[in-house]
């Protein structure tokens, strides 16, 4: 399933047991006696008839045609086979929605049902609906009565009881969901409305500025030197793996200073880490330097292994996974402290960084940590979120087309030179292709961080940012305790977290560069383009902080590295309101663990649900 960089896909609301119970619903699989698999000829009376599989289908390559050329009495119908293999299992007392596509040259047709009584066997149940004549493909749907007691299976199809023909295809049968129980608050009224933050009793043992939720449910926390020159000089580089279920940390060996590297989760769950800190600045000499090394972290062995080198150094690079599993990386500082203009591409097929001559280059300087979002058509959207840059070519926003090797400027981003340390997120559902950019400041002039948000529709013919709602204000610590924000005071260092209810939690931040933490959190609803203030993290979360969704639906926040060089090792956990409204549905089965884009997948849960999200 795609990671956060790929956004969130909305699954159309379906009942908890919404799965097509009809086997071979489009007649594509052949059976015996000239009939498709799991379908049989049925009927009675004095009439002349034919059953045929025809190419004139609604979808696929086949449809079923039943024709009566003479009739005195009786009917003919293609029914789901009355067998334990083919007849759908039903539950007494439940109702089922039946659907099909049809064409008909006769008004004498009906959807007919039979049921299997556990004592008496198969018997006629009811005719549910007469189908109107239709020259073109027409959809018909009907809901069954409650299944009678003692019934364990049903079968059904279209009866033809007059001269003419009925051609049918694409049958569906889904159990009607039970009524959704009303939400029941399981905490205080305020917590049920705004959620709750808890500070964990155990601290994060490393100074991690990078966080990755792994495919096994654990969290990789990468520190490297943790922005500590003392650790760097001593060669002390660390990472930790946090287990949210056990509440434990495991510190693991880390081969290089991955402080301010780039990273991305690969399709198989491993984590690709690129570049990092080769050297701290020297007074009167060089600045930060980025190295060319790259590593892969394996969640199974919890170890790093080296890949081939990048073509250039990249301290503070971006990393975006493409649709084919390749990774493209831009920006950051080179080994000589200058800005890198080299694009890098990781080949999923070759499991290596490609040599320079195999990578398209525009020789653009994208700044540091440029926020690159994969678009549905394969291009990349640079949102304008970045760090450490005033008026550099990497400010503003643009669309980058790797295949065409072009960069197209995108207008509309407010105060583009004051979006340092802002956040950008592909809003749910991802297929809507809208991006929200939140807050920011400027490391050079260091003004008060702003409350600005901007929204862009990347599916528009000529995409451009439009003004979004302002970030709600909270409290700020200006050095003498928390006071209410005033005027246009906003925040930089914002974290934006996609939630499974389709909303986005924005949390954390600071009013100035590495100073004055802001205590505010709110939910952004993409459906209404509004913010709703919620409970705020009691811990400072500024520079080198992160917040992310845990597999159980809670949000974890960690880190803060103010200008005095200290580190906040406290970890906060946010419980959103949706976890405080009654018993949670549980996924009981998933057919396939690996999904292809466009697949139809079946997930079973233990209680009625309204919708599901892929994150």
Say what each PLM segment does.
Residues 4, 25, 150, 593-594:
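Compositionally biased, intrinsically disordered low-complexity segments
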Residues 1-18:
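Secretory targeting and sorting signals
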Residues 5, 36, 148, 177, ...:
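Alpha-helix initiation/capping motif
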Residues 181-615:
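Kelch-like beta-propeller repeat domains
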Residues 18-186:
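Extracellular and organelle-lumenal recognition/adhesion modules and their flexible linkers in secreted
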Residues 2-3, 158, 302:
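Short, functionally important structural connectors and interaction interfaces within domains
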């Amino acid at each position: 399933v795609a990671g956060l960089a790929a956004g969130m896909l909305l699954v159309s609301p379906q009942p908890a047991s919404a799965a097509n119970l009809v086997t071979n619903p489009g007649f594509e699989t052949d059976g015996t006696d000239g009939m498709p698999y799991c379908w049989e000829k049925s009927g009675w009376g004095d009439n002349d008839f034919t059953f045929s599989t025809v190419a004139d289908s609604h979808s696929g390559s086949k449809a079923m045609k039943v024709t009566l050329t003479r009739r005195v009495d009786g009917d003919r119908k293609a029914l789901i086979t009355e067998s334990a293999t083919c007849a759908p299992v039903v539950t007494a007392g439940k109702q089922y929605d039946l659907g099909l596509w049809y064409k008909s040259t006769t008004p004498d047709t009906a959807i007919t049902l039979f049921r299997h009584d556990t004592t008496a066997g198969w018997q006629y149940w009811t005719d549910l609906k007469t189908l109107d004549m239709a020259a073109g493909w027409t959809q018909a749907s009907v809901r069954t009565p409650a299944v009678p007691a003692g019934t364990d299976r049903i079968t059904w199809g279209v009866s033809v009881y007059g001269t003419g023909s009925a051609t049918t295809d694409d049958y569906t049968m889904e159990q009607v969901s039970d009524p959704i129980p009303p939400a029941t608050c399981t905490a205080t009224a305020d917590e049920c409305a705004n959620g709750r933050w808890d500070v964990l009793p155990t601290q994060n043992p490393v100074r991690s500025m990078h966080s990755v939720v792994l495919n096994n449910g654990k969290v990789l926390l990468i520190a490297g030197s943790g922005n500590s020159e003392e650790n760097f000089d001593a060669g002390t580089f660390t990472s930790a793996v946090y287990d949210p279920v056990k509440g434990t940390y495991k510190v693991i060996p880390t081969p290089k200073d991955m402080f301010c590297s780039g990273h991305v989760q690969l399709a198989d769950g491993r984590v690709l880490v690129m570049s990092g800190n080769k050297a701290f600045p020297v007074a009167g000499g060089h600045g930060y330097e980025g190295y060319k090394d790259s590593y892969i972290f394996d969640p199974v062995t919890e170890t790093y292994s080296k890949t081939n080198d990048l073509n250039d150094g990249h301290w503070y690079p971006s990393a975006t996974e493409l649709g084919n599993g390749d990774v493209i990386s831009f920006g950051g500082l080179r080994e000589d402290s200058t800005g890198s203009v080299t694009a890098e591409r990781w080949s999923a097929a070759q499991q290596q960084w490609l040599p320079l001559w195999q990578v398209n280059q525009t020789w653009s300087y994208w700044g540091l940590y440029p926020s690159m979002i994969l678009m549905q058509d394969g291009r990349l959207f640079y949102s304008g979120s970045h760090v450490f840059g005033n008026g550099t070519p990497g400010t503003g926003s643009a669309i980058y087309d790797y295949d065409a090797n072009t960069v197209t400027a995108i207008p509309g981003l407010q105060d583009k030179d004051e979006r340092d340390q802002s956040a950008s997120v592909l809003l749910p559902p991802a297929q809507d292709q809208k991006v929200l950019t939140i807050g920011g400041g400027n490391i050079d002039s260091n003004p008060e961080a702003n409350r600005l948000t901007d929204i862009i529709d990347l599916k528009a013919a000529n995409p451009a940012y439009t003004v979004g709602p302002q970030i709600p204000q909270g409290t700020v610590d200006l050095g003498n305790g928390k006071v209410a924000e005033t005027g246009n005071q906003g925040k930089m260092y914002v974290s934006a977290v996609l939630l499974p209810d389709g909303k986005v939690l924005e949390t954390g931040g600071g009013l100035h560069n590495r100073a004055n933490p802001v205590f505010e959190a709110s939910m952004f609803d993409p459906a209404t383009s509004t913010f709703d203030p919620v409970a705020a993290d009691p811990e400072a979360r500024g520079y080198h902080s992160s917040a992310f969704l845990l597999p159980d639906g809670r949000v974890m926040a960690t880190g803060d590295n103010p200008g005095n060089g200290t580190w906040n090792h406290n970890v906060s956990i946010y419980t959103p309101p949706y976890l405080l409204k009654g018993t949670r549905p549980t996924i009981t089965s998933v057919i396939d663990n690996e999904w292809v884009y466009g697949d139809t997948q079946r997930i079973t849960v233990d209680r009625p649900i309204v919708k599901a999200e892929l994150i």
